[in-house]
Amino acid sequence: MKYTELKDKSIKELEELLHAKKAELFELHVKLKAMQLSNPNEIKKARRNIARINTAINAYYSSSVE
């Protein structure tokens, strides 16, 4: 997921996507603890995707304030 894809979405879509990605990250942590996660690098990717979504949300709010 790239930032350019995210900046075109509405705030509602971004918040729904953020909620879904946080749930996915939780599932990955559970799988890691249960030794069922085949690729631990997926946690890093999920965290970075969450950060990208948060950046897009913050950019939306900062542009609406100005």
Swiss-Prot record:
Source superkingdom: Bacteria
GO MF annotation list: structural constituent of ribosome
Tagged with keyword NADP: no
PROSITE patterns documented for this protein: RIBOSOMAL_L29 (PS00579)
InterPro entries assigned to the protein according to its UniProt record, in alphabetical order: Ribosomal_protein_uL29, Ribosomal_uL29, Ribosomal_uL29_CS, Ribosomal_uL29_sf
Record PANTHER family: 60S RIBOSOMAL PROTEIN L35/50S RIBOSOMAL PROTEIN L29 (PTHR10916), LARGE RIBOSOMAL SUBUNIT PROTEIN UL29C (PTHR10916:SF0)
The protein's name: Large ribosomal subunit protein uL29
Organism listed in the record: Helicobacter pylori (strain Shi470)
Designated gene of the protein: rpmC
